[in-house]
Amino acid sequence: MTEARQTGDAMDVGLFGGSFNPPHIAHLIVADVVRDQFGLDEVWWIPNATPPHKEDDALAGVEHRLAMTRRAVDDHPSFRVCDIEVQRAGVSYTVETIRALQEQHPETDFGLIIGSDSLDHFGNWHRPDEIADRVPIIVYKRPGVIEEVAEPRFANRVHFVSAPVMEVSGTEIRARCR
């Protein structure tokens, strides 16, 4: 369940999913810039239990990634960790997460935060049209990726963020730690 404030007030929340293998400074900066530019009350970080696009052997254990993510956001009052994908068995599909969160939090307006690298293949995601119908898509630029909507059918649901481009990746961090 989401470790978020429990009030009767409507909220605007950004859903920031990822493997967070590990969470790093670029994730924190992006989440903060998105929260600020879009006037979000909170950003919910959602570590993927079993992402459909990554090999299991490249990932730290899900409980370890969840713990790292909690530590990373601990000092940020507008950031929360949502373990919905960790609690749900099987592959983590964004559309299922969005459906469940909208059902659990009907007064909350959600937006999906993704990198421009993910936007490039968003049309290949599981049920992308339903995702785009349910939530706006907030896109931050990733290094080396062109900032444009590959599929015009999603263009009116995509909003780009003016965020600093960070040359940091979990892959690079893991390689330096070996």
What residue ranges belong to the model's regions?
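Nucleotidyltransferase catalytic core that binds NTPs
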Residues: 1-178
